[in-house]
């Protein structure tokens, strides 16, 4: 896959970058990435993936832009209030990089449709705001052997990890699943919604950009991805911490008793 002269100029800072270079930029151009959610995390994530030259971006979101979204969902603007988020995101991506193909999925990802959606892409990034979607996405990515970058934000805190449970580590042990990290969703109502607890707008930008970095890393293959590691960010005290987590042999996806 060749580059036009405009693409060479556009991606020049990647092409000269050790770890990406021309081969890595070609991988980005060939890549298909599914982004779940065009909200607080999905907005900066889409911006950086489009700018990086990912060849195809799919976005799953069935919501419309609300005025209260604009404090953090920076891909949308005031004129977009009331508009479908996938439509607003499509315009923003095209404005940023017209070389990127955009596919909007006007629906909510769930256990019934997740595998079909995931199967059409190479990498998945989940920026959803509920556990039902997170479990559905992580299960589907396991079954379809797709890397999953998953992030979450609270009021002043955020977390990020990368899941590749269809592969094994250097010791020959399966990589952990999302269910190894969170075996069960929290009780209903125990985690307040963003509208109740609030969220620091800039925090979603920080984590969304870090999610984009993990996606680019997964495509290009450089560095040490967050597989088996949970990155925690405390924005109140501006502290970062990384916690290791292991494969749980009792997990239902790739545990010892899981169906083969």
Enumerate the predicted regions with their spans.
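Adenine nucleotide-associated cytosolic modules
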Residues: 1-260
